[in-house]
Amino acid sequence: MNDYPILLIHGTNCRNDGKHHYFGRIPQMIEEQWKKCYLLYGDAWGTIAHNCELYRWQIKRILSSESCEKVHLIAHSKGGLEARYLVSTMEFAPFVASVTTLSTPHQGSRTAAIWEKRPLRLHFIGRFLEMYWRQRGDLAPDVVSVVHSLTPAAMAEFNQNNPDVPGIVYRSFGAVLAQGHRDYGMACLAHCLTHWDGETDGLVSPDSARWSKNHQLLSGVSHRDVVDNRRKKSHCNYDWRRFWYLLLEWLAEI
């Protein structure tokens, strides 16, 4: 059994700071069941490379303060790509025991490709989002670059440049929404994206979330509820406490 610290990496259009951080009640639960849990702080609309530069120094400080050899990375949505980039491109593999990704678009999003074909709209919305998130702490938001990086073509290149590193345990989880789900925002998005991406959790399709041989599909849960972002009952069979408890048990055996 190991007790390496657990580091949580957020996705796009959210930050890990502020009164209502990204992972809901999960950090408190991990602290109760585990030794240490840390939130990593990146830009809401930072590129993968930019956010990983921010994470690099945070991880080094954690390794030093905890006097530990390695950490576990648990990352949601685009954060899963950043976790893989840290290990492969930034050569953090010696300091990472495992990488767990939750609803991460490893194979890209057709919806992102559609947005890229509408550059005027994308630039207009991007300017608004960048202004908004700069006021909330983003250092270098870049919506257009982030959207491009999530297209299937860009992700194919990313996957080629960031293969799994031997010695690190990878695990991925995808999700798909159920009818009657109470996360109405994600349910609406899922309906809108059906034409391009098929079934999704509201943003990411199960096929895109698949990575590594160790993969599991969560049925009836939304993109946000995987990480308790809404802090509400998901009105399905998904029990976030049980899911995270089992995940911690699995990490303890690595």
Describe these PLM feature segments.
Residues 4, 35, 69, 94-97, ...:
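A structural micro-motif
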